[in-house]
Amino acid sequence: MLKNIKTYNPLSDYNKVIKKLNNNGVRPTKQRMVLTKLLFEKGKRHVSAEDLYTELRKEDRRISLATVYNTLKQFTKLGIIKEVVVDQNKSLYCNNNKSHYHLYIEDEGKVVDIPTENINLDLPAFPACLNLHNVDVIVRVRTLKDIIKN
């Protein structure tokens, strides 16, 4: 007998994005929907604006790099994706909207999701006038071979 197997349904994410755009007064233009498809059709991932632009070019889509950046910025502001700043010159965009942290493997330039229950955080008490909005954690590691070289 088969147990419940969770399968990834990119159409679900696609429909959620359309709804979120409409709820925030943002038109789901063809360009936004092409980028949405690209962001979500391959499952959970971390991708740069340049990587998305390259994927668009391979599909012969005519969307400028500036439009890619603007759309990613807008999607981040709306909470559709998260920006993961891995260094001062590079951001990756995460399409996993469940609460989680990130592991950044510096020498590989790779980001991996870490479930929140795998990291314990002790946060200070906040004044009553403040409300905790979000906690971003990026754990930075290097592979042992990279450490030995340095």
Q: Model regions: which residues?
A:
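Short capping segments at the starts of secondary-structure elements
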Residues: K42-S48
